[in-house]
C-alpha cells in the first residue's frame, strides 16, 4: 500500500525552536502510546536540536522514516532548488501513521509547514484529535483546507 504524506518545511529552525517542536511532538508520541523506533524501526526515535526522526517499531509496524531537520535540505541530489524543504513519508497506513498525521497537523498549524496527503480529511481525523489531546489545543484538520481549495 502506498499511503503517503507530503510536506514542505518553509524555513530553517534555531536550536531553541527545535527544542519547542521536540516538546510538542514528544507530547504526541507519549499520548499516542504507539511504539516507535528509529529510522529503521529499531532502537529509539531521534529528537535532537538538529533532527527529529522516527518510524514504526519493527518490520511489521514500520515503513518509511518520518524526518524533519532544523536546516532544510533538498530531497535528493540534483533536485530543483524550489524543492528545498520538501519531504514525504510513506506510512502505508501502519499504526504509526496516526503519530505522523498528528505531528504534521502541529507543524502545519504552528510552524508554517505546507502539508498534503494521499488521504483526505476523514483519514486525518484521528491524528488531528491526537494532536489536540496531546497539546491541549484545538487544531483544524489541514486536509479540510486542502479539500476546500
Named regions from a protein language model:
Residues 1-149:
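Acidic (Asp/Glu-rich) sequence patches and key acidic residues
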